[in-house]
UniProtKB/Swiss-Prot annotation:
Residues 23-42 have a biased composition (Basic and acidic residues). Residues 12-22 have a biased composition (Polar residues). It comes from Synechocystis sp. (strain ATCC 27184 / PCC 6803 / Kazusa). One of its GO terms (molecular function) is RNA binding. One of the primary rRNA binding proteins. Required for association of the 30S and 50S subunits to form the 70S ribosome, for tRNA binding and peptide bond formation. It has been suggested to have peptidyltransferase activity; this is somewhat controversial. Makes several contacts with the 16S rRNA in the 70S ribosome. Residues 210-220, 259-276 have a biased composition (Basic residues). This is Large ribosomal subunit protein uL2. Part of the 50S ribosomal subunit. Forms a bridge to the 30S subunit in the 70S ribosome.
Amino acid sequence: MGIRNYRPMTPGTRQASVSDFTEITKSKPEKSLTTNRHDQKGRNNRGVITSRHRGGGHKKLYRIIDFKRNKQNIPARVAAIEYDPNRNARIALLFYTDGEKRYILAPAGLQVGMTVIAGEEAPFEIGNTLPLSRIPLGSEIHNVELVAGRGGQMVRSAGAFAQVVAKEGDYVTIKLPSKEVRMVRKECVATLGRVSNAEFRNLKLGKAGRKRHLGRRPHVRGSVMNPCDHPHGGGEGRAPIGRSGPVSPWGKPALGAKTRNKKKRSSALIVRRRTK
């Protein structure tokens, strides 16, 4: 992927940049692997806002991604690298030798015509999926399972990768992109390589309209609201928040307060907590 910077012809294009999409080989998605998905707009089943600043944006078809990679020992040819509007990584269309088609997250370096496979005896190559117990120390991996058979839940965003740092007993220790070090069962699977589209982090939207196009609404500061809308609101002019520390709209400590439940069972598997 490359980044194309706009010339400063207008205020909106002055700082804007876009992907050049040179790695994309197919423009329309595989119809059998897409589905309509109702846009929640940040609401739950009762219509109550549970995730603020969401709504609008362009309509999208959801691409059904194979995060489980449970088609064991059957080779698949990479037929295309595609754009997915639902995530910042690219996706790869696979044609299996038995005729089935599936989408997977495209690792960096995966190209059309290459062959990938999942299984315990899969070769050590980019795009192949193996149990963590079979992956050498120091290897870069992504799409990592937390529970065997549930499918990859960690390390799925553009450019992300984890590293295998140790193996002991029934657990494999991995270092996550957040610098957290945690143990995972050795039966859990992961895919070799790092996720594609690593330069996504360098894109600049340039104007608010592109953010709205992505389905993100304005993030309004609490200090400019009324006191009925936010604990930071009210006062004459630019008043201080009037509390010992910043809080959320519902009065909970914000901006740095630890929110993880101390009684979580998985805390025993975290060797080193993530850094800020």
